[in-house]
């Protein structure tokens, strides 16, 4: 059994294991992780976790969904920055790694996207088709797209060779992560089906059954559909009674 230091598709430090030239798998080296967040976190907080020595002398990098984002993020990792670090927000998994032996540090941000199955699993093709929302294709990679034009989605064919999709049924909801131009591990979404929404604030929160849920950064909703019920300027707190909706929850509460 052999171990080779590497990085996973999200840019996190990892170890690749092989046995007699056969790949066993690549696994994140969590022993190097010094902090983890699922909400907005200040540039000062991340700076303190990385440490002054590492920020000044180590090779430091930053990635969003596996895409190099060092130029956008690292200037904001500063001891006097009390604002949320670029890209960090509700529902974004931000992880900070420091490797003192190799003098390296990495900040990674992983978004979670809603995907809906387009059809039942095809046993003949051994695959399932999904539409994943809040994304767009940019060259060979995918990036978050928050445009309200109804076109913020990407279609994926997921093979049974890569993931167990044998139980996927049409309209099933899943929580997707995406990196390196490909689907990464995904899980079924917790769904509140056929519920009334008592209030909705665009880009902020939704209230269902007396419970207020904050929107994930990658939350997606059909802006044109909202206009049917709320008018052209649907950016205030509004009432959506007399209509039922499906509300999808991520794993971060």
Please report, for each region that a protein language model flagged, where it lies by residue.
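...the same signal can extend to comparable exposed beta-sheet modules
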Residues: 1-253
